[in-house]
Amino acid sequence: MRDGDILKDKKILIVDDEPDILETLMELIDMCLIDTAPDFETAKKFLSKNTYDAAILDIMGVRGYDLLQITTQKDIPALMLTAHALSPEHLIKSIKEGAHSYVPKDKMVDIETFLSDLILAHEKGLKKHGRWFERLKPFFDKQFGPEWREADKDFWKDFDLKYMVTKEEVGDVI
């Protein structure tokens, strides 16, 4: 199944304080039914009235972590999309607080793929939804340096066990 097929008519909330980002995302996932919010209060109102298949949340400028808390309580899988909060610390915080994905705005052009992975994993009830990380690890290694996971070894060991599918597990499924 193609990413666009997975996303067709999915209800998505996009929250970002940059109008050009909202516009670009709407164009990239135009097969979805989209609500956009430029700030926390607007997003909070949408979340109180509507249900969503997923949310794309900026971190800075829109109180993204507060919105993440709301989406997590409502069982709406959230993809954190960031430029200013692009750091190992924010990546870890996003995961710990319930984000299903953490995507740099530099990789926004691939949002259809990341969002499809997220929604498919959520719909199937998959606990191991780390495909986004597999796709982005080379980017993170380049951005943060090859040893960036060493500072939080225990977190990343736990992350790998919880969210990454091993070769053996893939073999069991096939």
Identify the residue ranges that each predicted region occupies.
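A short, hydrophobic beta-strand element within the central beta-sheet of small alpha/beta folds
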Residues: 56, 60, 68-71, 75-88
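Alpha4 helix (beta4-alpha4-beta5 surface) of REC/receiver domains from two-component response regulators
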Residues: 66, 73, 85-113, 117
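Phosphate-coordination loops involved in phosphoryl transfer and adenosine-cofactor binding
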Residues: 9
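Acidic, metal-coordinating helix/loop segments flanking the phosphotransfer/catalytic sites
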Residues: 19, 36-54, 62
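Alpha-helical interaction/dimerization surfaces of two-component signaling modules
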Residues: 24-29, 46, 70, 93
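Acidic di-acidic motifs
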Residues: 14-17
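C-terminal output/effector regions of signal-responsive regulators
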Residues: 120-174
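Two-component/phosphorelay signaling modules centered on CheY-like receiver
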Residues: 19-36
